[in-house]
Amino acid sequence: DLLSTIQLNGITLLSLLFLMIEIFPFIVCMMEYFDKKKIVGKEDKKSLRNCFVIILFAWIMAYLALFPGVYATDAPYWYHEFLRKDIPISSQWSPVYCGIFYLFVNSGKLFFDNYSIGFAVFTLLQMSISLYVIWNILSFINDKTNKTLVILSTLFFLLPMHVILSLTSAQDSIFTASFAMVVLLLIEYLLDEQFLDKKNTIKLFLWMFLMCVIRNNGVYVLAFVLLTALLLKARRKLLMLLTSVIILVAVYQGPVYALCGVQKGTALREMLSLPL
């Protein structure tokens, strides 16, 4: 619908600027108010839960408004590359993500004779993962800083673009969530080198691997982290963890792709961010 398309032009940018100017005094007043209040102990956790409940409510309302979700332009190809044998499965998009998308959408058709039901469950799951990551981020901010930053972070997560992305059939949503968790866990490790116990090591390993599985250029992130860790002479445990994930991803994108008949050749283009 052309009438529903937002035109990104000078007027739109100017409108956004005026909107930010109007919101800014409200944010400043709120920051000054909470700076004057000393909040400790159980009240911190209560305010954290209240902030998350606000985000949860807003996101559920957005989910209902956008129900069953937002179909991206590539979604039809993802569906048909698993449905039809004459269309090869491409590594340009994550085969795992596309396969899960197909599984949910096709299940909606098989069990309810409705594609939208399957897609609604898919977007709900994707949104739940994003909310889980948001909870972890808010908890970290609440534990390490103060309530003011929790409030500001809550306002940030209430921006419409975040929930819209989480309800869109785009691998960027899960990639962003996994990337954020990797960064968060690495920050935890930098603050406390004893953080990487068995449980947290497995958690970091899985989030790193998921980040690379969802988007091919996730390997670039790990390569940069590995290089930085080597220069900073990080502990061997972290170096081995990063190396093992990169090796596993190489096996996944090599022999596993070949075994499953995934067509390669476009992944490098995506990793280099070249136009299609």
What are these regions (language model features)?
Residues 200-215, 226-230, 245-252:
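Membrane-interface alpha helices of multi-pass inner-membrane proteins
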Residues 66-80, 87-104, 108, 112-117:
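Extracytoplasmic catalytic/substrate-binding loops of multi-pass membrane glycan-assembly enzymes
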Residues 1, 15-25, 44-71, 246-258:
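Transmembrane signal-anchor helices characteristic of membrane glycosylation enzymes that use polyprenol
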Residues 3-9, 64, 95, 115-123, ...:
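Aromatic- and kink-enriched transmembrane "portal" helix at the membrane-lumen/periplasm boundary
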